[in-house]
Structures are given as C-alpha cells and as structure tokens.
Amino acid sequence: MATFALPFCEIPEDLQLRILSLLTPAEISSFACTSKRFASLCQEDGKIWHVMCDQRWGKKTKIQKWANGQIPYRHLYKTLKGLENLIGFWRLCGRANPAASSPPLVFFDWGSSFILGSRVLSTGDDTYEVKKTPFLLMGISPEGRSENFLDLVGGNLRSVDDDLKELEASNNLVSVDVNFMGNGHIMVEENRCFTNNNRREDQRSSGDESDDLISSPNFSEMYTQLANKTSPGGDRRRQKRKEKERQASRTKWEPEHFLKVADCSPTPTRPLQGLWKGFCEGSIELYLVKYDEVGGIICRKVEDLSLSRYTPPVFWTPKHTFIRSPFSAEEELLLNSRIHISPFAEVHENVVSGMLYMKSSCDLVLPGEPGNGIGFLRGEGRVWLYDNGTFGFGFLRDQFIIDLKRVALEDGCLADEVEACM
C-alpha cells in the first residue's frame, strides 16, 4: 500500500503547533525565518508559547494559573525553565549551628501555580515514615515578578490558593529572595525591600486617615473620647506599636545556602548511591551515599553535611565491588550473631547477597552499649547488600546491623510519606 507524506504547511495548525512545541526556542526562531506564514505562527504568544509550556509542564502544574494567567506565555516559559532545576532534593550547607526550623534535607516539587519547598522530617513514631512540612513557596505576580514567601512558624502553606495576593497580607510569612548561585546552589535571604515598601504603604495609609480626622472632625466621637480619656487615633497608634514590637521580637531570618543532591538515585553500576534513612538511636537518621573517584563508597549523615565544620564519614569502603555469597564460615557467624536495628513494625527477612569491608573514624555505638571490638581495628566493619537492593552496615566492635531504606520518589511524591502530596 502506497503512503503519501503531507507537506508541513498542509498539516492542521494544531498538529503543527504540537510538532513545533518539541523544538527549542532557538530552533523555533530559525524555523520562523523560513516563511512569512510560519513567522506569524511562531510570533503568536497564545499559540506557540502556550503549547510549548503545556507540552513541557502541563502534566506537572496548571500553567494557566501561574500569575493568574496575566503574563505572556513566552515570559512564563522562560521563568519555568529557570525554576524547574529546583525540583528534587536539596541539603542545607554552611551553617555553624543550624536552627531547629532548618532541617538538613528539603524537597521541592510542583504546586498548582507555584513551586513548593518542604522540609523532610521523621515522624518520630518508630517507623521509616517521613513527612513533608512546606516552608517556602515560589510563584509569579501578575506583573511578572518573582514572589517567594517563607513560613517561619510552620503550617501556613499547607493549603495555598492560586492567588498569591493573600500571602502578602499574612503576618506569619516573610518575603524572601531565592538567588541562584549556579545550577546546584541557591541562597535564600529575607527581602528587606519588600518589608520596607509595605511599611511605607502602611504609614501613607495611616497618614491619610489622620488627615481626614483633622479636616472633618466628628464632635460626638471627640466628646466620647474625652469622656473615656482617650485621644483620636489612639487605637491605631496602639496597633502600630504592637506591630513594631512584633517585628522587633521576630527573629531575623539569616540567609541559608542549599546544595542540590545530584546523585540521589541508584544506577546499575552504583546500587548504593543516593539518599537513605536508617533507624538509629531511637529516631530516623538520613544518610547520603556517594561513590568516590578512587573506586570506594562514602556514607555521611545529611545532618553533618549541613555544618560549616568538617565531620568524619559514618563509614567508607576502599572498594565498591561486592563479595558475593556464599561467604566463609567466619563471615556467616559474624552476620548471623547480630541484631538488626530497625523500626518495631519492620520484620527483617532480607537475604544477604553481597558484602563489603568498611572502615570508619567515627564512633557509632548505641547509647548504653559499650563497644566490644577487642582485637579489632577501630572502625572496622561490614556492609551487607540485601537481595531487594537495600543494605545494612555494622561495626565489629558491637553486635548490631543498622538496616537502611531508600528515601525514594514514587510518581513525584516521597515514598513512605504520611501526608498526601500537595
């Protein structure tokens, strides 16, 4: 059966736009130079740029809701392209003494008309479950400006409307700037200009009200105030004084730096790479495992990586090639004589398929349990790979194995998350 190819110009316009949406802006500019008809098609913001935004982000966010639909789609495309690098895990860095409101791991994902940053925290209930607490919202104003709001207290960003105007009036949110220091580095700092502008607007509005009182006195109100020994505008002054006291009492938001966790997922050649969570010392601890340049594996606590000072790794292995089972009788005894540390609801039934020798310079002994590593090298231990892709580790000086589970994403949401994704 013979087939015929239609010229591009004879294809229906909606299909033309879908095909063009697969190109880059530079390629579309080149295509627009081929004819006046295509130049006109590529210049219509409501057609080509709308389809390009929908093609790239339509399944992730509601592109018509951004900036209340009042900015050109060409501007929206450029903005979303810059923001999409935020999606994923980031870790706090460079803090000498991080505040309790600044957990070491955060996660950015798409909202309906904004990007939402959430702190990743343990539920604290003896399970592997984690929870996301929104703390940073990034959107666009109808004028096309970036609008970023930080929740210092918590709980104010769980239910957000598409209209960000309501957030500007909230006393529990702080306007911040999110500065990109590179593809994998951002700095969040308070937007003082926004605060000062709002303060000047309040002063102007209160001044206008004072002028009205002077020009149009209400004598009955005046006598009432004299009888109550109050002065005109006293309530407003008290309110302003309370607002100043609230501003003074609020802890200044110190700039914070975040680095993107680039290698947070495993690969066939690097099965342990990424973010992990383990039940240690009565709570969930987060770990970051990386493969180094010399063929070894390094495991660090995410919390330690947020500090400005150097902290030793939890463990490191000189090699990354696993020793496969069956193991020697000595290694089998070493494995089977240990207690698996995991949440109470978890039952360890994993089969060990591989093993690595590891070392560490830090103490990892459970409270109240002295090390029993007499005759062993300090920090020597084992990493055991399970048949389901997870692993556990333990030191020869004690009798425990800390089983780790991956901090994973399922359909863009955190696995083992106790709350519904927003």
Swiss-Prot record:
Gene3D superfamilies in the record: 1.20.1280.50
Pfam families according to UniProt: F-box-like
Classification via PROSITE patterns: FBOX
InterPro entries tied to this protein: F-box-like_dom_sf, F-box_dom
Region (Disordered): 197-216, 226-252
F-box domain segment(s): 5-52
Domain of life of the source: Eukaryota
Biased composition (Basic and acidic residues): 197-207, 242-252
Protein name, per record: F-box protein At3g12350
Species of provenance: Arabidopsis thaliana
